[in-house]
Amino acid sequence: PGTAAIYSDLGYLLLGLIIERVAGVGLEEYLAEKIAGPLGLAEGILYNPPGKLKKSRQAYFPTENCPWRGKVLQGEVSDENCWVLGGVAGHAGLFGNIESVLGLTAAILEIWQGRRVHPHLPREVLAFFLEARSQVDGSTWALGFDRPTPGSSSSGRYLSPRSVGHLGFTGTSFWIDPDKELVVVLLTNRVHPSRDNNLIREFRPYFHDRVLELLGLV
């Protein structure tokens, strides 16, 4: 402990189980009632999309051709560990459209800045996670969130050092910049039809640079 910063799903998978034990309800229900619900996003940020929507291309784009399940996934979690757990886990499994993800990240920014109150997410708790500094020298990680790495970050060149964000394996990401008062969300299905496509690594920083350039925030 304290010697290296290692990205791992296991801690947040365990955290999801702890939340269920303490709250006395499933993580899916907890998300809907305690986090997304008060923001009006219970139908936009969710686990396990309703069956009737899974095959609607207007609702959920296909992702990868999964050898385990013998089909192209659509409206079904890509992460294998989350799938084994029924599609609900602390580290993976969320679905959302651009409006809902923007709404969630904008709410995080507003709560962080003290401009919005959430009944179950006090600013002090949120700031503890977003502003935490790793005890490991050279690590950019906060608690559950990444920060820009000089010269090599997916956030590009222009977001402030206090920015926080996270990437999704299927080709998604968000970044929240408290100094520029900006949130940037990218939703793609880069694993369709195969997870071998890694061009997203070049596209993400380019995308963020272009967004900030077009907004005049460079």
Spans of model-derived segments:
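Short, surface-exposed loop or secondary-structure junction motifs
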Residues: P1-P161
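Short loop/turn motifs at secondary-structure junctions and domain boundaries
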Residues: G165-G168
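Short, surface-exposed beta-strand/loop micro-motifs that present aromatic residues
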Residues: T170-V183
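A short acidic/small-residue loop/turn micro-motif
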Residues: R190-P193
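Short, flexible/disordered intra-domain loops and linkers
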Residues: R195-L199
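Surface-exposed amphipathic alpha-helical segments
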Residues: I200-V218
